[in-house]
């Protein structure tokens, strides 16, 4: 493609019933055949659930809390987004293939689309889930500034699309539920964004235990500090400001917008809230998963 702008604001394309960016669908065979390595750590999330936060925490852990080492490159190069392939711009599969082990890998794929090599290699997986109402609000603003997405339309229209699962990476409801079930069979640490906001130290300790890493308190405190929202928001290697404006327009909405729980209350009308809740109960009643919508 000669014109890089041709890749933006295009409609999503279904892969096995899941709407994905057209460019991922076009290069699906490359994603599907991705070769995981046994010492890979996979960060899996539905979009806007704390992916970049956990990516930065893991990179800090792997570098013993050395924040300068973690500024060696942008977060999307340190922790490549495996399935993201945009012709002429990025290829997550190729980036990862060229990376030395141990690799930290990012994905937003629903459990049924994850390349089988992750299961075959019994890779450790950290899944982060965030309450649906905060996700949809954050996703709406992200759609506006990250132009690989189709146009979001109005808030009302986007909310309807989200409830119908007609957004990139499909329905939030199925995503969080199926990964929750999968944790019974594989090495998956399932974390909640709200718990991380409430007590980040405790959640980082869970991650360390899962990774079988023991670090001194002093380094843990460094990791806590450098992975805090206020510090990451000002860190160009963590806040995505190094991306081209054509890809992400931070003047529309910053990538790191608020980083709080309960912001949905500033966006939903009472009628939207009631409709969303009624639909939510139906979609989630078959799961033992419980979310907090504020802390």
UniProtKB/Swiss-Prot annotation:
The consequence of residue 247 to L is: Reduces enzyme activity against dopamine
Q: Where is the active site?
A: 108 (proton acceptor)
- Tissue-specific expression: Detected in kidney and liver. Detected in kidney collecting duct cells.
* Listed InterPro entries: P-loop_NTPase, Sulfotransferase_dom
Localization, per the record, is:
Cytoplasm
Q: What EC number(s) does this enzyme carry?
A: 2.8.2.-
The biological processes this protein is annotated with in GO are: catecholamine metabolic process; lipid metabolic process; sulfate assimilation; sulfation
Protein name, entry field: Sulfotransferase 1 family member D1
The family assignment reads: Belongs to the sulfotransferase 1 family.
Please name one Pfam family that this protein belongs to. Answer: Sulfotransfer_1
